[in-house]
C-alpha cells in the first residue's frame, strides 16, 4: 500500500505551509489519489525538531475540513489521521477517517488506545522516544550494541498497550520510525535489518520519504545524473527531487525485506516502482509468466 502524505501544517520540514488552506489541501489530495495513492495520511502537527506543540483545537481546525472535503469527493479512499492526541483521533474518525497513525506508538496520550479500540479502526504504531518537539531530534537517540533490538522491544510495548485496550491484532501495523529518535546509523541499521521487524508478525509501515537519512545516503553515494549526490552539501541543501528518487530506491529494498506499507510525498514514482518490484517477487513473477 502507498500512503500519500498531506501535511496541513505551516511548519513541517518538507512542505510546511504549502497546503494550509483547505482548497490547496484538497487539490493536493486529488493529486495524490490520481497518482495511485491507496490512502491519504493527513497531519496537522509538525514533528520536526523544535516544533511547538499544537493544541488539539488548532489541530482539529486544520484537519477536519480536509477530511470532510476528501470524504465528499472520494467516498471510498481510506483516510489516515496522523496524530498523537485522542481527541483529534476521535473527531477525525467520526468524520470519516479509518486509520490512526500515532507517531508516539500510543505513548503520549493514555486515552488513545481506548479511542481506537472503541472505533474499531486500524492503527499504525511508530517507534519514537520523547515528545512531539524532540522525537525527531538526536536527543533521545541513545542505544546500546543492538539498536534494532531496542526498537523492536519498544515496538512490542506499544503493541501490548494497543492489544490490552482491545485493539485486534489484525488492525495493527508497526513503523520502526526511520529518522525518529535515531541517528543516521541507527536508521540505516533498521533498514538493513528490517526482516527482524517484519518477524514481529505485523504489517510493516515505512516512512522514510525525504528524511535526513535519505539526504545522508545521497551525500555519500555517487549517483550519475544527480546534481547533489556525492557532495558535501548540508542535508537541507539537497533537493526534494533527489530525496524523492532516493526514497523510491529505499522503499523497493524495504519491500523486498518484507515491508508492505509506504508513506510518501510523491506517489507516482513510488507506485510505479513498487508495483514493478512486487511483480518480480517469486509468487507474482510466476503468475505473470502464465
Predicted feature locations:
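Short polar catalytic/cofactor-binding loops
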Residues: 7-11
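N-terminal glycine-rich anion-binding loops that anchor highly charged ligand groups
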Residues: 1-4, 31-44
Amino acid at each position: 500500500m502507498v500512503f500519500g502524505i498531506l501535511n496541513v501544517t505551516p511548519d513541517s520540514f518538507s512542505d510546511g505551509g504549502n497546503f494550509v488552506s483547505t482548497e490547496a489541501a484538497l487539490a493536493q489530495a486529488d493529486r495524490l489519489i490520481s497518482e495511485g495513492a491507496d490512502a491519504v495520511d493527513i497531519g496537522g502537527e509538525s514533528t520536526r525538531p523544535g516544533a511547538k506543540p499544537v493544541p488539539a483545537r488548532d489541530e482539529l481546525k486544520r484537519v477536519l475540513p480536509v477530511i470532510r472535503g476528501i470524504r465528499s469527493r472520494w467516498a471510498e479512499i481510506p483516510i489516515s489521521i496522523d496524530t498523537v492526541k485522542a481527541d483529534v483521533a476521535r473527531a477525525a474518525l467520526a468524520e470519516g477517517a479509518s486509520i490512526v497513525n500515532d507517531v508516539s506508538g500510543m505513548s503520549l496520550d493514555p486515552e488513545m488506545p481506548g479511542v481506537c479500540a472503541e472505533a474499531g479502526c486500524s492503527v499504525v504504531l511508530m517507534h519514537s522516544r520523547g515528545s512531539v518537539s524532540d522525537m525527531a531530534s538526536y536527543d533521545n537517540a541513545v542505544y546500546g550494541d543492538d539498536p534494532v533490538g531496542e526498537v523492536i522491544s519498544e515496538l512490542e510495548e506499544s503493541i501490548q498497550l494497543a492489544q490490552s485496550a482491545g485493539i485486534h491484532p489484525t488492525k495493527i501495523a508497526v513503523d520502526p520510525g526511520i529518522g525518529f529518535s535515531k541517528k543516521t546509523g541507527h536508521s540505516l541499521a533498521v533498514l538493513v535489518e528490517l526482516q527482524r521487524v517484519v518477524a514481529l508478525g505485523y504489517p510493516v509501515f515505512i516512512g522514510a520519504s525525504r528524511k535526513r537519512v535519505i539526504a545522508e545516503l545521497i551525500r555519500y553515494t555517487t549517483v550519475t545524473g544527480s546534481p547533489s549526490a556525492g557532495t558535501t552539501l548540508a542535508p537541507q541543501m539537497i533537493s526534494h527531487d533527489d530525496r524523492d528518487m532516493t526514497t523510491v530506491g529505499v522503499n523497493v529494498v524495504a519491500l523486498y525485506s518484507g515491508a508492505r506499507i509506504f508513506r510518501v510525498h510523491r506517489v507516482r514514482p513510488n507506485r510505479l516502482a513498487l508495483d514493478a518490484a512486487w511483480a518480480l517477487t517469486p509468487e507474482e513473477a510466476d503468475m505473470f509468466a502464465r
